């Protein structure tokens, strides 16, 4: 826990916006998602292997996982990578991470997917 105080504004808790992912990564992911249906998961996994910090890629891997456990694992990795990214961008454990900011979609998609898959496997701690 930080010894630094959290500064509140008249607008409420601070808002954190993740940086936009590199255009090359977004292009590679778009190409992978446009592959024939039987190849999408493998192509997305290749993007994740090349860019393991990409929250959009982890979200896509979770979205295209072969089963609930594979989806859960991908979303969980993306969620934890997202927490690291949020902290690196000033988030201190509280405040807004809004869907309205497109660059937050990878993290928030992983969070949503993690919640859904955790529920499906009876993981109540999530």
Please report, for each region that a protein language model flagged, where it lies by residue.
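N-terminal alpha-helical interaction modules that lie
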Residues: 1-56, 61-96, 102-105, 109-111, ...
């Amino acid at each position: 826990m930080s010894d630094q105080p959290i500064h509140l504004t008249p607008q409420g808790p601070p808002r954190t916006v993740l940086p936009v992912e590199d255009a090359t990564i977004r292009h590679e992911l778009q190409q992978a998602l446009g592959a024939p249906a039987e190849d999408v998961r493998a192509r997305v996994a290749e993007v994740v292997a090349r860019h393991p910090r990409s929250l959009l890629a982890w979200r896509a891997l979770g979205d295209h996982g072969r089963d609930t456990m594979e989806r859960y694992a991908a979303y969980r990795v993306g969620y934890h990578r997202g927490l690291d990214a949020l902290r690196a961008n000033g988030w201190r454990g509280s405040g807004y991470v809004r869907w309205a900011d497109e660059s937050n979609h990878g993290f928030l998609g992983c969070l949503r997917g993690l919640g859904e898959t955790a529920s499906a496997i009876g993981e109540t701690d999530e």
